[in-house]
């Protein structure tokens, strides 16, 4: 099965009717199950895309999506920030009606109740195989915080997803590792991860103490543990073999998304893909560095468009 049918948001909403207040029956004919991919990008404005009139940067792959589907010029979001906007999308609920839906630290517990009937649950009930790839920022693990050295549960697999390859929070927050199906990718058990958002742990340098080690200037509290020359929000130590390389994050997201698509090309699938771009820190791959002529923000817009192009292929 390799159906690609552009959909408007209105065609998805009925699946979420009732969301967390019950288990709606979903009945979809076999011949009406197109593959569905949600692409969630942070900090991307309407003026950043050429399909919306941007003239100094070209986004041909996103433009093709706009030409084939529905381009919105008047829309509303439940929130303008990471965690609550994702919570609203996946649950169909207003985030301000529940506690703990503010921007989550990187060691937060899973903030969506596994008893909640999510969008992923609805898709799963309709016969779709479901996957989540990329930025998550909805917490992982039990109340009390996440232990990144063991299998993490509950996680995305407990709220409707069959597969996950996740950035636990954001790229500007520790821990700077990927999690695949509850396990930190590439973790050496002899170098366990410790994460804290209240005080420094370990002896890794920080942006506030060692600014000479930075390749990007810290701002807005981004002056804690330094990873890859970038100071993050929060402190971590350990997990050296599992640390991501910022310049390669977009490539990893594109790879894992396309691998999921290839594995399930003969069955209906639902893929939720959260990109790292164009959120800070903006660290484009060398293929895109300096290419936009608009600084790193312009470069990562090009990188985002490339990522979407890879998925569309």
Where are these regions (language model features)?
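Formylglycine-dependent sulfatase
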Residues: 14, 19-313
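Bacterial N-terminal signal peptides that target proteins for export
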Residues: 1-10
């Amino acid at each position: 099965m390799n159906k690609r049918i552009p959909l408007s948001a209105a065609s998805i909403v009925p699946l979420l009717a009732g969301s967390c207040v019950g288990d709606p029956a979903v009945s979809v004919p076999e011949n009406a199950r197109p593959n569905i991919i949600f692409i969630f990008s942070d900090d991307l404005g309407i003026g950043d895309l050429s399909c919306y009139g941007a003239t100094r940067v070209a986004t041909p792959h996103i433009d093709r999506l706009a030409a084939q589907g529905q381009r919105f010029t008047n829309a509303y979001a439940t929130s303008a920030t990471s965690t609550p906007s994702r919570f609203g999308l996946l649950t169909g609920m207003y985030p301000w009606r529940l506690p703990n839906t503010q921007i989550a630290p990187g060691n937060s517990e899973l903030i969506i109740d596994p008893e909640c009937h999510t969008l992923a649950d609805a898709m799963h009930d309709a016969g779709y195989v479901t996957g989540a790839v990329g930025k998550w920022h909805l917490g992982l693990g039990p109340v009390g915080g996440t232990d990144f050295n063991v299998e993490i549960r509950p996680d995305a697999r407990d709220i409707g997803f069959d597969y996950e390859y996740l950035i636990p929070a954001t790229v500007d927050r520790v821990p700077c590792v990927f999690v695949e199906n509850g396990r930190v990718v590439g973790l050496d058990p002899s170098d366990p991860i410790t994460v804290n958002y209240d005080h420094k742990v370990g002896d890794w340098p920080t942006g506030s103490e060692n600014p000479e080690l930075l390749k990007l200037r810290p701002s807005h509290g981004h002056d804690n543990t330094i990873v890859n020359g970038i100071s993050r929000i929060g402190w971590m130590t350990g997990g050296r073999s599992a640390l991501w390389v910022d310049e390669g994050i977009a490539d990893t997201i594109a790879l894992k998304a396309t691998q999921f698509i290839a594995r399930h090309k003969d069955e209906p699938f639902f893929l939720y893909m959260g990109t790292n771009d164009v959120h800070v820190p903006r660290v484009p791959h060398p293929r895109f560095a300096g290419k936009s002529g608009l600084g790193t923000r312009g470069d990562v817009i090009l990188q985002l468009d490339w990522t979407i192009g890879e998925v569309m292929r």
